[in-house]
Design a protein with these regions (language model features):
Chain B
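Haloarchaeal acidic low-complexity proteome signature biased toward cell-envelope/secretome components but also
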Residues: 1-52, 56-200
Length: 167, 200
């Protein structure tokens, strides 16, 4: 079984600096299990924006250490990919009564990266690691409606990082 | 004391200025949050719990009594003090959801002395901004918004939104009912969960 592990911004923020136990716990987990976290392009852009007074999350360190990589471009000509993108966007908009076109496209991109890997057959299961419950549940719901219910798991980024500390 | 104001127009705490002034002093906020959690407390207990000198403890308590957020519950010695409920209610225009955030907000402000992310956010956006962020933190944990929704509403970067939401999360889980969501390590198939090794 091949799985794709897709990581959102919050996972890297929750890990903290490479000197922290949280970061090291996730790295150890990835290495031990030969996992490379896949970061959608929009998420990578978000993580590497330069805001003063704040430490940049350790995404480049994880890429250099080869347990994270940036996802390839999304192929919107695959209809499952574009349907997933639109579906999650609507799901997130509906939760808060907003117009769908106001929803930032990094949220649905997590699910769209999963959809592309599943339909192209590069993975038979997608794990989405996010601290945004709405994005995680939206991805599960929309991909379930596309017949991929058993193939997608939303992993709560906070619980994941905390549980690795306890192991 | 009670007031209602609106998140969207940015005047979250306009009616709340006396308490907002108080919130400028994180030590006072810490003291208030401690009393709110512990109930009736003597000055001696506060000195011990918060590591305060006697003079400082009395100054803080008297200041909070004068502001009206603490009251003495006994006339005998030693006096005990308790918090008066202060309900600041915030209603969003979009969804009509209401939040009573006072105790959580005061606790959050009290943590700025030890939490750099909260301190940075207050320096940039003020206590009123932190109150707004707290409402998004509640909504995020409940699955109504994402950090990106907050970023676009408040015109800040998604990363800045994520950082303050994570800093506020322990407060949200302490003061609000949050259902757990999503899977964790045990739900990831085919992995070795025993990751305790020294390969770093």
């Amino acid at each position: 079984m091949t799985a794709i592990h897709i990581a959102d911004t919050g996972l890297f923020v929750a890990m903290g600096h490479p000197s922290k136990r949280r970061y090291q716990g996730v790295r150890r987990f990835a290495r031990r299990n030969d996992i490379t976290f896949v970061i959608p392009e929009r998420v990578y852009d978000e993580l590497t924006v330069n805001i003063s007074e704040t430490e940049t999350p350790p995404v480049d360190a994880a890429i250099e250490e080869q347990w994270a990589r940036i996802a390839g471009q999304l192929d919107y000509s695959i209809s499952l990919v574009s349907r997933t993108m639109d579906g999650v966007q609507r799901y997130i908009a509906n939760a808060d009564n907003r117009p769908a076109d106001e929803i930032e496209r990094a949220d649905p991109a997590l699910a769209a990266v999963a959809a592309q890997a599943l339909i192209e057959g590069t993975a038979d299961h997608a794990y989405i690691y996010t601290t945004d419950r709405l994005a995680g549940e939206g991805a599960e719901t929309i991909l379930q409606s596309e017949g991929y219910g058993d193939s997608v798991t939303y992993v709560n980024g906070f619980r994941f990082v905390e549980d690795l500390l306890d192991l | 004391m009670s007031s209602t104001s609106n998140r969207a127009n940015g005047d979250v705490i306009r009616d709340f200025l006396s308490v907002a002034d108080l919130l400028e002093e994180p030590q006072l906020a810490q003291l208030y949050a401690y009393l709110a959690r512990e109930g009736e407390t003597t000055v001696g207990e506060l000195m011990e719990a918060l590591d305060l000198a006697q003079g400082t403890a009395y100054t803080y308590v008297n200041q909070l009594v004068d502001t009206g957020v603490l009251e003495a519950t006994t006339d005998g010695q030693p006096r005990t003090y308790t918090t008066r409920d202060i309900d600041l209610t915030i209603t969003t225009t979009d969804s009509g959801r209401e939040y009573t955030i006072t105790a959580a907000l005061i606790d959050a402000v009290g943590r700025r002395t030890t939490d750099e992310d909260i301190d940075t956010y207050i320096n940039r956006h003020g206590i009123a901004g932190l109150a707004t962020a707290l409402t998004y933190a509640v909504d995020r944990e409940r699955g109504d918004v994402t950090h990106r929704t907050m970023a676009s509403d408040l015109d800040i970067s998604p990363l800045a939104a994520e950082i303050i939401l994570q800093a506020l999360r322990p407060i949200v889980t302490e003061y609000f009912e949050i259902e757990p969501s999503g899977g964790s390590v045990a739900d990831i198939q085919g992995v070795d969960q025993d990751v305790v090794s020294d390969d770093t």
